């Protein structure tokens, strides 16, 4: 079963249900997807700030360090970077901006499943409630409570409604994190999913003390020389397939080594690639060094990244998605090309008109 659109009333009912658990619970673990972006980090940190303000015990857990561009976010230093979860379980686990449980990454998925949490856990641990908060169409509804609202341009919008309705403390720290979440997931309010509600929420956050210039400047206009050198190396790998109207760039472990950077320093690079004209889709292939290649995809309105990413167990939005390939960086482009060709052929067949039956 996958998520579809819900009404404002249905959203309000689910938020009230979540509120009951927030009131009753003392301990919380907050998770984002692998390689957390601005939306997922902003939501987790806003929730951390709000729950700590009412005296709850809260942990934000990630396997990767926070990307440099997000290290100005309030409470980013409270994030626990670990591959081993703390012992036991909290009263509530909140997973945000994550279309399926696998997107937590096998490191966390396996540990939680073994402790009785998640869709594949047998038996389930009844004393821990798993809350799934997301805005992606096709979310696999893996939680005990699933609040998924695809009408929200960013997960940050959903968390804005959640925190407002539950009347949790909405400090300036909360507001900055929510604003950064919305800003980054709407491409600086430029993507097609941006609407008047997005701007209304942004306006309210500014009234609470957010400096929009500072947030934009810290996220998009603060790069180190090493990051620029890395970007130059990435762009030098640009490979074009004119027949299929796509191109890709690569990030190797060697590039990271010689420039003194880490993979999180590639955050935002794929959005730069999207600005190249006359292509339906572009990909950034990132060598993880463990037999996997992580792929970020961006497209125009002629190509559905989300549907394509699902072929590899990933997902996201029609114009921006991600997935992981079990392959070497040398093999990944060929697998990608073959999958694209097959995908386009399937789409073409679906668009062919039905033939009249012969009489």
Regions found by a protein language model. Name each.
Residues 78-83, 147-150:
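Short acidic-hydrophobic, aromatic-tinged amphipathic segments that line or gate anion-handling sites
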Residues 133-201:
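Short alpha-helices
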Residues 2-34, 42-71, 81, 86-90, ...:
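Hydrophobic helix-and-loop "lid/oligomerization" segment in the mid-to-C-terminal part
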Residues 82-144:
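Active-site cofactor/cluster-binding pocket
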Residues 35-36, 98-101, 136-138, 253-254, ...:
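Short glycine-rich anion-binding loops that position phosphate/pyrophosphate groups of nucleotides
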Residues 71-73, 105-106:
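Metal-dependent catalytic neighborhoods of phosphoester/phosphodiester hydrolases
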Residues 38-44, 101-105:
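Short glycine/serine/threonine-rich phosphate/pyrophosphate-binding segments
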């Amino acid at each position: 079963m996958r998520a579809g659109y819900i009404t404002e009333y249905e959203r309000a009912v689910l938020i009230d249900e979540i509120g009951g658990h927030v009131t009753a619970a003392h301990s919380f673990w907050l998770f984002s997807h692998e390689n957390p972006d601005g939306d997922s980090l902003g939501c987790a940190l806003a929730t951390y700030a709000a729950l700590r303000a009412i005296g709850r015990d809260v942990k934000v857990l990630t396997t990767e360090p926070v990307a440099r561009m997000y290290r100005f976010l309030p409470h980013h230093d409270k994030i626990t970077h670990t591959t081993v979860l703390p012992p036991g379980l909290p009263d509530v686990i909140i997973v945000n901006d994550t279309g399926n449980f696998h997107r937590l990454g096998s490191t966390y998925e396996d540990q939680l499943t073994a402790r009785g949490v998640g869709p594949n856990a047998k038996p389930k641990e009844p004393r821990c409630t798993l809350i799934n908060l997301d805005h992606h169409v096709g979310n696999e509804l893996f939680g005990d409570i699933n609040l998924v609202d695809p009408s929200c341009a960013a997960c940050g919008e959903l968390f804005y409604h959640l925190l407002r309705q539950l009347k949790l403390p909405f400090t300036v720290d909360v507001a900055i994190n929510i604003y950064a979440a919305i800003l980054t997931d709407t491409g600086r309010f430029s993507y097609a999913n941006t609407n008047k509600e997005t701007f209304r929420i942004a306006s309210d956050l500014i009234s609470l003390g957010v400096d929009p210039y500072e947030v934009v400047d810290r996220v998009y206009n603060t790069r180190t020389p090493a990051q620029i050198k890395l970007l130059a190396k990435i762009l030098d790998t640009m490979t074009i397939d004119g027949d299929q109207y796509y191109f890709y760039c690569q990030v190797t472990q060697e590039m990271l080594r010689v420039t003194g950077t880490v993979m999180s320093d590639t955050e935002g690079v794929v959005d730069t690639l999207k600005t190249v004209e006359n292509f339906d889709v572009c990909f950034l292939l990132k060598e993880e060094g463990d037999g996997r290649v992580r792929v970020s995809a961006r497209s125009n309105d002629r190509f559905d990244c989300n549907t394509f990413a699902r072929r590899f167990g990933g997902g996201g939005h029609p114009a921006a998605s991600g997935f992981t390939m079990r392959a070497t960086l040398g093999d990944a482009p060929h697998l990608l090309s073959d999958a694209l060709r097959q995908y386009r052929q399937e789409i073409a067949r679906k668009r062919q008109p039905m033939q009249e039956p012969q009489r």
